[in-house]
């Protein structure tokens, strides 16, 4: 999920864990199969029940979504263990849901599955003596950010406050503060997870280190994480961040890309930046924008802000906020809107290590013409910029799987539209635009960040060609039947 421009019918009765009543989904009595072995605080829910959409996690995007015959909300690690072992016994497909933000084509292959909704796992422990934060998969970034800020601490986080912390972590976790302490996986110190066989294991540098390596970037393929512990850091500038946002006419987009290119190696580690250009179907006009965060003083941020002011924004604002409140307040105060669930959207993306002004201008011009011819389409060209000093400073043995540590930018094609009847058309033009961006990305072939992936890129792109042989070996060891990771699967051969 990105910063603001910024998966059956059943009876209408919720079955408790102790219930033995006949509740059915897709011709299978899931309450009978699972109900007897769950803890008292676990529950079983069926699509079609009046409160299903409010008692279970709903997906952020309905594009390429999985379908579920039943949702089970475990309350303990042993519940997750029991669900996996029981599903294996009855040959039932299952999928774990944390925040519901995953959006790749592979999820559409999951049909009538058992949804393991992890929203009960609210563990949230700040240990200042050990300098760690331990969270469960029921927590978004916002669940712990305020506590960290109040303690004078920080941890790398993603761009949107509503995204699941562990879900973002297992894909690497890019974000506005990664210039200071690296990716979210770089702060990860251990996980507890339930494997495909239903075993509960710990993975860290000391225990199951090969599994821990794989979890950091390919975690969705190896189990269901029920707890994760992170190292935390002292927050600079008393934890306060300068947020500066700028709105411009669409004609300024080229000047924004030129500015981005000019910053090059001088781009500071304290800064996060998102630039975008879009077209309004309502007004028939284009617009562009920039959102800058600086983890430091106003004085230190001002030279960068001044360069954006020199482009004569039609609207702008400058505020100093606790780092824990920046995401919610982005988008001129509309940051929460990016978290709305149930929209139909996808986001092909490209990792880049250089800025091509002419390509960005040309791609945006083509995008505008595409949107003008398709009144059902709302799209934006989004560029997120990062300082790579901290990500590249991580020792090779500690890096995990993520192959994009040298990405200075992620370029995203955001597509919102009204449903699957347009999928083929959107894929066709998105693939063409993506290819143009790849050609001047500074890489010889398509690179991307797995949490922004479309799903067609393949495992060499998601995980890195050099990492794949070791990953395949570990996949065979820990998940030999391919139970996990349908969104971005690691092959077994």
UniProtKB/Swiss-Prot annotation:
<comment type="function">
    <text>FAD-linked oxidoreductase; part of the gene cluster that mediates the biosynthesis of azaterrilone A and other azaphilones, a class of fungal metabolites characterized by a highly oxygenated pyrano-quinone bicyclic core and exhibiting a broad range of bioactivities. The first step of the pathway begins with the non-reducing polyketide synthase tazA that assembles one acetyl-CoA starter unit, five malonyl-CoA units, and catalyzes a series of Claisen condensations, methylation, PT-mediated cyclization, and finally releases the first hexaketide precursor through the R-domain.</text>
</comment>
<feature type="glycosylation site" description="N-linked (GlcNAc...) asparagine">
    <location>
        <position position="53"/>
    </location>
</feature>
<keyword id="KW-0274">FAD</keyword>
<feature type="glycosylation site" description="N-linked (GlcNAc...) asparagine">
    <location>
        <position position="41"/>
    </location>
</feature>
<feature type="glycosylation site" description="N-linked (GlcNAc...) asparagine">
    <location>
        <position position="29"/>
    </location>
</feature>
<dbReference type="InterPro" id="IPR016166">
    <property type="entry name" value="FAD-bd_PCMH"/>
</dbReference>
<dbReference type="GO" id="GO:0016491">
    <property type="term" value="F:oxidoreductase activity"/>
</dbReference>
<feature type="glycosylation site" description="N-linked (GlcNAc...) asparagine">
    <location>
        <position position="253"/>
    </location>
</feature>
<dbReference type="InterPro" id="IPR016164">
    <property type="entry name" value="FAD-linked_Oxase-like_C"/>
</dbReference>
<feature type="signal peptide">
    <location>
        <begin position="1"/>
        <end position="17"/>
    </location>
</feature>
<comment type="similarity">
    <text>Belongs to the oxygen-dependent FAD-linked oxidoreductase family.</text>
</comment>
<keyword id="KW-0732">Signal</keyword>
<dbReference type="InterPro" id="IPR006094">
    <property type="entry name" value="Oxid_FAD_bind_N"/>
</dbReference>
<dbReference type="GO" id="GO:0071949">
    <property type="term" value="F:FAD binding"/>
</dbReference>
<keyword id="KW-0325">Glycoprotein</keyword>
<feature type="glycosylation site" description="N-linked (GlcNAc...) asparagine">
    <location>
        <position position="318"/>
    </location>
</feature>
<dbReference type="Pfam" id="PF08031">
    <property type="entry name" value="BBE"/>
</dbReference>
<dbReference type="InterPro" id="IPR016169">
    <property type="entry name" value="FAD-bd_PCMH_sub2"/>
</dbReference>
<feature type="glycosylation site" description="N-linked (GlcNAc...) asparagine">
    <location>
        <position position="91"/>
    </location>
</feature>
<dbReference type="Pfam" id="PF01565">
    <property type="entry name" value="FAD_binding_4"/>
</dbReference>
<dbReference type="InterPro" id="IPR036318">
    <property type="entry name" value="FAD-bd_PCMH-like_sf"/>
</dbReference>
<protein>
    <recommendedName>
        <fullName>FAD-linked oxidoreductase tazL</fullName>
        <ecNumber>1.-.-.-</ecNumber>
    </recommendedName>
</protein>
<keyword id="KW-0285">Flavoprotein</keyword>
<dbReference type="InterPro" id="IPR012951">
    <property type="entry name" value="BBE"/>
</dbReference>
<comment type="pathway">
    <text>Secondary metabolite biosynthesis.</text>
</comment>
<feature type="domain" description="FAD-binding PCMH-type">
    <location>
        <begin position="63"/>
        <end position="235"/>
    </location>
</feature>
<feature type="glycosylation site" description="N-linked (GlcNAc...) asparagine">
    <location>
        <position position="387"/>
    </location>
</feature>
<dbReference type="InterPro" id="IPR050416">
    <property type="entry name" value="FAD-linked_Oxidoreductase"/>
</dbReference>
<keyword id="KW-0560">Oxidoreductase</keyword>
